Amino acid sequence: DSEKLESELNIYFIEQGIGWKLVNGNLEARNPEVLEQTIQSATIVLQEAGSQTARGELHEALMDLSRRPEADITGSIQHAIAALECVFRDVANDHKSTLGELLKRYPDMIPAPLNQSIEKLWGFASEYGRHIREGRNPEFSEAQLVVGVCAAAVTYLIGKKNI
């Protein structure tokens, strides 16, 4: 059976120190366990909330981290921020504003001073993920950080919406 084969291959990959895993027949890069759990939790929350667009963006962020031979680092940052922006728009019921505008209009959506960290994340993503300049390439670990923080923020915002 395919699930058993997938499980056995993943165990083998771990035992051999191979940084890959098989997920639903697709080979993906293995990320740090805490990042994997954060993304998985966010994906489930988004699925249950019916936020398919944000879920798709988060999935694309993960796929971009897994691309080989070179990860699409800027793509992962862009998709992670897009997921966060999509959820923020939905929770704020403001479907036209950018994430930067939403953060200014709804400063209490994320409690201070945590809201400042999201503003800084937005700035980082704008600088390194969207409007990248020659010689200023983000690192893989920075992309993982952005994806993880966005996944956690998405989970928080969906929870806030459901209160």
What spans do the regions from the language model cover?
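Short, well-structured alpha-helical interface segments that form or flank functional binding sites
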Residues: T53-G56, A71, G75-A82, S97, ...
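Internal, Lys/Arg-enriched amphipathic helical interaction segments that engage polyanionic partners
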Residues: D1-G56
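Solvent-exposed, amphipathic alpha-helical segments
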Residues: G56-R67, L121-H131
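Short, solvent-exposed segments of well-ordered alpha helices
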Residues: V45-E48, Q52, R67-T74, A112, ...
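Long, charged low-complexity segments
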Residues: E36, S97-I163
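Alpha-helix capping/termination and helix-coil
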Residues: L65, P69, L84-H95, G129-I132, ...
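Short, hydrophobic, well-ordered secondary-structure elements
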Residues: R55-L62, I73-A92, A151
